[in-house]
């Protein structure tokens, strides 16, 4: 029997408008890990059950370090989500990725310092230590559907893969850091994908991201360096591409049989947990 598909959408800077949902209703959820960033907005897209959550709160009052990523992911799991699709604003570290382009990331580098990265932290609810493997980092099948849907829509400036460096923030990178990330082979820099992607995998959710390049960070010797005004202006100008892709991909995901994918993910997580034992 196929699992019932329910898709969580985590909206980042510039994409937390509940108008993309039909038959909207708000749901207050609290978790063992605290409260999520905002209420959950439940509704439908093309008849598919969806849940929208504003990562930074609907008034964008929560800085990246203070987002309760564990509560956000656990809240979506609690209400029955099988998938999570997120949007995120990023700085481009490569000339070929232009502001306004979309990237479907396939890997990450973690440069955060202050964030809880596991649900298995010694609490009474989840026993043991979870050494979850992060290859693949994102759900391969969900990424494939996003890529194919972008092609079908004829969206220009869509890159099929990319490595994202997640920094702690809220400050932007120094030029030395930006160039270091480029030397590492990174394509984008942002402040929110980690630990979100890690926690989603621990929770057994099929997670994929749509990253929008909003600027060139500060590595270039010519042109303006990243600033908030330009980031938001670029996102606002191109956000319709993100919403178009999300609304088109959701019915495609719902049509597919995810039994094996979800089963394999659950098996991976369960096999990663080391339980306490006596010597």
Curated annotation (Swiss-Prot):
State the organism of origin: Aedes aegypti
Q: Which GO terms describe its biological process?
A: L-methionine salvage from methylthioadenosine; purine ribonucleoside salvage
Q: Which InterPro entries match?
A: MTAP, Nucleoside_phosphorylase_d, Nucleoside_phosphorylase_sf, Purine_phosphorylase-2_CS
Which Pfam families does this entry report, sorted A to Z?
PNP_UDP_1
What this chain does, per the record?
Catalyzes the reversible phosphorylation of S-methyl-5'-thioadenosine (MTA) to adenine and 5-methylthioribose-1-phosphate. Involved in the breakdown of MTA, a major by-product of polyamine biosynthesis. Responsible for the first step in the methionine salvage pathway after MTA has been generated from S-adenosylmethionine. Has broad substrate specificity with 6-aminopurine nucleosides as preferred substrates.
What's this protein's name?
Answer: S-methyl-5'-thioadenosine phosphorylase
Ligand binding (substrate): 191, 215-217
Task: Name the protein family.
Answer: Belongs to the PNP/MTAP phosphorylase family. MTAP subfamily.
């Amino acid at each position: 029997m196929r699992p019932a598909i329910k898709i969580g959408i985590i909206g980042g800077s510039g994409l937390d408008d509940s108008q993309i949902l039909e038959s909207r209703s708000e749901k207050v959820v609290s978790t063992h890990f605290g409260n999520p960033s905002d209420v959950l907005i439940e509704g439908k897209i093309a008849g598919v059950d969806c849940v929208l959550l504003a990562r930074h709160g609907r008034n964008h009052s929560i800085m990246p370090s203070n987002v309760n990523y564990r509560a956000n992911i656990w809240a979506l799991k609690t209400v029955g989500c099988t998938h999570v699709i997120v949007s995120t604003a990023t700085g481009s570290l490569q000339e070929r990725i232009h502001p306004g382009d979309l990237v479907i990331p396939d890997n990450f580098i973690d440069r955060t310092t202050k964030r809880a990265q596991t649900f298995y932290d010694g609490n009474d609810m989840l026993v043991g230590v979870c050494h979850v493997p992060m290859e693949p980092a994102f759900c391969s099948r969900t990424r494939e559907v996003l890529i194919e849907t972008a092609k079908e829509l004829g969206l220009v400036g869509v890159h099929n893969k990319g490595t994202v460096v997640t920094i702690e923030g809220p400050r932007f990178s120094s030029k030395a850091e930006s160039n270091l990330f480029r030397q590492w082979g990174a394509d984008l820099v942002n402040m929110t994908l980690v630990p979100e992607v890690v926690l989603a995998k621990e929770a057994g959710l099929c997670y994929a991201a749509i990253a929008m390049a909003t600027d060139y960070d500060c590595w270039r010797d010519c042109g303006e360096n990243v600033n908030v005004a330009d980031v938001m202006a670029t996102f606002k100008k191109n956000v319709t591409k993100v919403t178009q892709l999300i609304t088109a991909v959701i019915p495609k995901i719902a049509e597919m049989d995810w039994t094996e994918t979800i089963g394999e993910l659950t098996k991976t997580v369960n096999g990663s947990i080391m339980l306490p034992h006596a010597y």
